[in-house]
Amino acid sequence: MPPGPWESCFWVGGLILWLSVGSSGDAPPTPQPKCADFQSANLFEGTDLKVQFLLFVPSNPSCGQLVEGSSDLQNSGFNATLGTKLIIHGFRVLGTKPSWIDTFIRTLLRATNANVIAVDWIYGSTGVYFSAVKNVIKLSLEISLFLNKLLVLGVSESSIHIIGVSLGAHVGGMVGQLFGGQLGQITGLDPAGPEYTRASVEERLDAGDALFVEAIHTDTDNLGIRIPVGHVDYFVNGGQDQPGCPTFFYAGYSYLICDHMRAVHLYISALENSCPLMAFPCASYKAFLAGRCLDCFNPFLLSCPRIGLVEQGGVKIEPLPKEVKVYLLTTSSAPYCMHHSLVEFHLKELRNKDTNIEVTFLSSNITSSSKITIPKQQRYGKGIIAHATPQCQINQVKFKFQSSNRVWKKDRTTIIGKFCTALLPVNDREKMVCLPEPVNLQASVTVSCDLKIACV
């Protein structure tokens, strides 16, 4: 029986559809990678180590691909010709995913074209801190085995950059030891202090663990390590009591963790912003604030180190020095950047007692202050003042000669002097900018002067 007209139309239509679509030569759609996430544990089941490696690539920064073996890596978006960033978190009290990790990964992938691998060891880092410490060696071995798989794929040791947070910084150090210190870089974000301050260099992060090791210290009086552990060690705001963090224990968890986690947020901010988080070598924080360390000539030959992805932190000398303490001041919130200026006051006449002068920079309702102390029988004193706006945008400077007024007797002492300032690093004192006229100060009286500095 011949086909009816409707059947003929059906077959003809199907043939046309096949010719226009099925035979067009288009490849089937590329399957999307399966996205994985961090594990979650609790206080009772989080002590046994269980490691996941999650790969994030520039084309899909929000999707973590679970990569365990070589076949997983070959079938993923991993690119052996790019650099590899390995993020290792630290101790997790409650067994939860780090709140900062997603932002960190996305920011890192925006800042650089690289493979980013997050090491999830929630199982093994939860519960009791000392149990997590015991898992460090085993975790380091597992990470080393994983990195060996990358080397088989053609990755070079020097292209691997480990970023370790708190306890994760010492894990990174141990991994670096297993590779003979030939990994490219290790960044320790406030490396953990408990159990590590008195540990040997084989047991903790150390300058010998990679070609370049840096550490950012923000909580040296509590959860962070207080000793230098890298080639360059940034002691931010002296390494403790970060601005904007609670200073009293009644703030609870925030009091415990705010200073410690500031290193993470500083690093993320350094990746996001163009303003430099530049630091200056000095023997101590006190000496830095007193204006005794004005450049980076010793030991960096003028190349001041900076937080972020700049190669070797911007340090260009070889061989690299070790355990160099560098200091910087920050604001209380992102982007945290501060400019540092030297301020000097030269007395016209010597005095038989110390002279304390408060100096304040003003710009667009933003103020920054510092104190200059001139020792008795000395001509001048100096200090460091940090300001969020560029120096050339500061339009006024205020002075207050601080004196010990008594209730029954007002101090009417007057001093005269010359004020000068310069932006750090001060490599040439001829670049100092001085007020054109001497400053007359009476005890406890505020004096304002216009400040004009050209923008370069």
Swiss-Prot record:
Enzyme class name: hydrolase
SUPFAM superfamilies attached to this UniProt entry: alpha/beta-Hydrolases
Known EC number: 3.1.1.111
Gene3D superfamilies recorded: alpha/beta hydrolase
Active site (record annotation): 166 (nucleophile), 190 (charge relay system), 260 (charge relay system)
Position of the signal peptide: 1-25
UniProt KW Magnesium keyword: no
Localization terms from the record: Secreted
A Gene Ontology biological process term: lipid catabolic process
Molecular-function GO terms, alphabetical: phospholipase A1 activity
Transmembrane segments: none
Family indicated by similarity: Belongs to the AB hydrolase superfamily. Lipase family.
Annotated protein name in UniProt: Phospholipase A1 member A
UniProt organism field: Homo sapiens
Record lineage: Eukaryota, Metazoa, Chordata, Craniata, Vertebrata
